[in-house]
């Protein structure tokens, strides 16, 4: 299986409607967003699918090292092998990938946010940065567009959190997030 086939399979297997939207993009942009999306899925799946927090931390540390190696020209994982040839063309920087990993790390360290500022910081890492990268891949360079894409990412993440409140309120050993207790101003 080639790296491109791997990221394609990862995107399809996620069941997300985003994948089908990607199909309308020109092939080079579609390849870039699919590889980036596969990266996000891989990292997020660590938190969602690994029940032992110690193992999850180890896997996220591995991804941090893989990103560092990839930007040094030595990627090994199929996702990074697919993404790196496109990263320069679309302005996908190491800090973007690191932010996504940092956000997933927050999932392991903090399960509740008591104010909107804390929740917004988390959403910035796991979704705002994703919006910014998507805007770059889609060819947008205007800083205002990047800011709007960032805010759209935040809105998507907040919507996901609200959607999952019932599920997260169920008595389990891990509660993903709760809504903040102070109003947003």
What are these regions (language model features)?
Residues 176-185:
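Single conserved hydrophobic/aromatic residue that forms the stacking wall/gate
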């Amino acid at each position: 299986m080639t790296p491109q086939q791997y990221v394609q399979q990862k995107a399809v297997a996620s069941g997300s409607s985003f994948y089908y939207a990607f199909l309308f993009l020109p092939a080079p942009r579609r390849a870039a967003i699919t590889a980036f999306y596969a990266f996000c899925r891989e990292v997020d799946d660590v938190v969602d699918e690994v029940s032992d927090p110690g193992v999850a931390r180890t896997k996220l540390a591995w991804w941090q090292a893989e990103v560092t190696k990839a930007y040094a020209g030595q990627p090994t994982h199929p996702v990074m092998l697919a993404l790196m040839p496109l990263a320069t063309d679309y302005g996908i920087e190491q800090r973007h990938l690191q932010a996504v990993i940092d956000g997933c790390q927050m999932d392991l360290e903090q399960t509740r946010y008591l104010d909107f500022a804390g929740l917004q910081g988390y959403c910035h890492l796991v979704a705002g940065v994703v919006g910014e990268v998507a805007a770059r891949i889609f060819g947008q360079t205007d800083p205002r567009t990047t800011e709007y894409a960032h805010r759209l990412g935040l809105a998507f993440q907040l919507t996901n959190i609200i959607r999952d409140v019932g599920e997260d309120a169920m008595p389990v050993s891990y509660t993903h997030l709760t809504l903040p207790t102070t109003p947003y101003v």
